[in-house]
Amino acid sequence: MESLETLARHVSPRGEVLLRRRIDEGHCIEELIINGVFAMDSSETSTESMLAELALPNEHAQRVLVGGLGLGYTVAAVSAQNVDAIDVVEIEECLIDWSHRGVTATLKAAADPRTRLYAGDIREVFGDASHGPVGPWDAIILDVDNGPDFLVFEENSDLYTDAGLRAAYARLTPGGTLAIWCQCPVPALSAALQRIAPSAEEHIIEVVRGQRSFGYAIYTLSRPRDSIGRARQE
């Protein structure tokens, strides 16, 4: 029998942020719901680890930018890599507060001394250097939505336009990688990344949840090491 427990709740200008725990067949599962949209849960988090690995293919990275704190799994996966500094931008300030309070074990990952949490909109980081941390970064990880077809906030659609993707790409160091998590393959996103640089790749990850199989997708785009890596001009 399944039971639900609310761990934390906050209403922001963008809607309700709900963190809850459910017991399902003896398993404790934490889930995050934002603005009425199911953002994620803790039942299967292997793709967060894969996201960090694909974004950080090299042995060492000085700086990494993570867009979206969520339940902290992506940040924890990045922390497990050889990284000097991790900048995390989260639009819902309550999630940062819950992280400092250690409401869940994975949110405590943000207490890593290498990690700095910024309350703000990741779009502004790419659009205006006066907001939040300033690049460039060796890796940029976007884990703010379930992909461009399943947005938590409609305004996030700007991130996945040609202009938005180019803005993120421009803030990578030479050899740096942009990685984007999606709950399913998005051909339009793949095409948009290919228009920027030939290094764009689609990684399909098959995950079994219960009796169902899902094909999640991670998209990566890397800047050349031996040049300034300018985006292709149309």
Language model feature labels by segment:
Residues 1-57, 80:
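Rossmann-like AdoMet
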Residues 14, 27-29, 61, 136, ...:
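A structure-centric signal for secondary-structure junctions around beta-strands
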Residues 22, 35, 142-145, 224:
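Generic beta-structure capping elements
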Residues 25, 110, 212-214:
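Short coil/turn motifs at beta-sheet boundaries
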Residues 45-172, 180-181, 191, 205-209:
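The AdoMet/dcAdoMet-binding core of the Class I SAM-like
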Residues 176:
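Glycine-centered, small-residue-biased loops immediately flanking beta-strands
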Residues 183-234:
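Class I S-adenosyl-L-methionine
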